Amino acid sequence: MTNATGRRTTIGVIGKNEQHAGDPVDAATMQAAYEVGRLIAAKGGVVVTGGLGGVMKESSRGAKDAGGLTIAFLPSMDRDTANDYVDVVFTTGLGRARNLLTARGCDSLIMIGGGCGTLNELTIAYADGRPAVILQGSGGWSDKLEGVLYDGQYLDERRTVPVQFAKTPEEVVEKAFAAAKSGGRPGQHI
């Protein structure tokens, strides 16, 4: 599938990283991330992530299993930190500042679970006018945001771009592609 410019649609998948054995992502969230990646690839989209573990790894694995292309913006300069399912690796050496690249390197964003880093990526996308769809029931900030949004869909009073919600991997991917096709309003609110 192509975006508003005629290029392949890039969908960012953001969510919780598994940093160590004591910080796991639950099995249902991992399965949802896998399915989201698989569905994006099946529609001809490109999966963009931060390239590490957890949601990033599983969405990349799903995309690869469906024959898709995956891109990652790593926080470090070490290519070996990328998960095994990344095709195109960009080492940034930027630490968490790489969230700017992850959020801006896609036509729309899908949020699955997540902590403060994921929330940071979402707010960057929102501030830029880039559409985002949140998978409800996936834990973390994905399950907390709806109750605090302005009018149930905006991160602040500027009402830059609506944040959408979906209950299934199929619905979240459909909404993300539709949002990407509409073009959002990227770059208007930098």
Where do the model's predicted regions map?
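C-terminal amphipathic helix plus adjacent low-complexity
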Residues: 174, 178-190
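Acidic/glycine-enriched connector segments
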Residues: 4-5, 19, 30-39, 51-123, ...
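Short, amphipathic alpha-helical "lid/cap" segments that border enzyme active or binding sites
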Residues: 34-37, 169-174
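Phosphate/ribose-phosphate-bearing ligand recognition and processing surfaces
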Residues: 124-152
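Generic N-terminal amphipathic, Lys/Arg-enriched alpha-helix
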Residues: 6-26, 37-38, 43
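Short, conserved catalytic or adaptor-binding loops enriched in Gly and charged residues
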Residues: 81-83, 151-159
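Short acidic-hydrophobic, aromatic-tinged amphipathic segments that line or gate anion-handling sites
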Residues: 89-93, 160-172
